[in-house]
A protein has these predicted regions:
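Metallo-beta-lactamase
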Residues: 64-123, 221-234
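Short, surface-exposed connector motifs at secondary-structure boundaries
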Residues: 55, 131-134, 192-199
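Conserved beta-strand hairpin/beta-sheet module of binuclear metal-dependent hydrolase folds
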Residues: 1-22, 123-142
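Active-site neighborhood of phospho(di)ester-bond hydrolases with catalytic His/Asp-centered motifs
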Residues: 9-12, 27-37, 61-63, 136-141, ...
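Active-site catalytic pocket residues across diverse enzymes, especially alpha/beta-hydrolases
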Residues: 46-49, 74, 151-154
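Catalytic core of the metallo-beta-lactamase
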Residues: 97-155
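Cap/insert and terminal regions of metallo-dependent hydrolase folds
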Residues: 144-231
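Active-site metal-binding motif and surrounding structural segment of the metallo-beta-lactamase
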Residues: 14-62, 157-158
């Protein structure tokens, strides 16, 4: 998910839909967690923006556990070069920044706030605030007690991008793997005090229409939309 032109939230295969010029502008990546569908594009991004004469490094922000996984299993000199030591260890192109729940990272006119969420591995959601309001991304999560108080505390929540991976018929698998279903999501949405646009993401391929219909049926009073490649959100 590209924020303005310089920040990504997660770096999955979707970055392949960005133009080369778009990739060249990215200098900040916030990772929700270390699962492959959220980091698969990171090596190619680092390779694309690598320049021995760079002015601004590529900084990856994530929980300590996520950064350890990326360093050990991705940029380890075997799967992919360790760009945190290139072109020189004292001045690397790729830098890591630990971002823990409750931390705020300010980049220009935007504040990125990290929220603890409940997935099968340590994970984060993020709120992004600028002068126009607040945009929130849940990351992968199941029902939890941490995301909703943070969202309710936002002054002007305009957009919520939230995952819902499985239809209600697969509730057991969703719970075991740390994901929402339409039923569990809409139950949690009742706790939300704001009325933002709600964009659904992370749906399993082939299940999108059924999941969307189940969410809309369970929450007919909410402004539910389906996120797709190329969608542009304004805050």
């Amino acid at each position: 998910m590209l924020i303005d032109n310089d920040v990504l939230i997660d770096a999955g295969t979707g970055i392949g839909d960005l133009d080369l010029e778009d990739l060249d502008s990215i200098r900040h990546v916030f990772l929700t967690h270390a699962h492959l569908d959220h980091i698969a594009g990171l090596p190619m991004l680092a390779d694309r923006v690598f320049d021995e004469n760079f002015e601004t490094p590529l900084t990856v922000y994530a929980r300590e556990e996520t950064l350890r996984a990326v360093q050990a299993h991705l940029f380890n000199g075997v799967i992919w070069p360790d760009f945190s030591k290139l072109p020189a260890p004292e001045n690397p192109m790729l830098r890591y920044h630990v971002c823990s729940p409750g931390d705020t990272i300010s980049i220009d006119h935007r504040d990125f706030y990290a929220v603890d969420v409940m997935h099968s591995v340590p994970s984060l959601g993020f709120t992004v605030q600028n002068s126009g309001g607040v945009f929130a991304v849940s990351g992968d999560t199941k029902t939890n007690e941490t995301l909703w108080p943070v969202l309710n505390a936002c002054d002007d929540l305009r957009v919520l991008v939230i995952e819902v991976s499985f239809p209600d018929e697969m509730e057991s698998l969703a719970a075991d793997s740390g994901h929402y279903t339409p039923k569990t999501l809409t139950t949690d949405l009742e706790r939300l005090h704001h009325e933002p646009e709600i964009w659904l993401t992370g749906m399993k391929p082939g299940e999108e229409d059924r999941i969307f219909e189940q969410v809309v049926e369970a929450a007919p009073d909410k402004n539910i939309k389906m996120l797709s490649i190329g969608t542009v959100l304004h805050v």
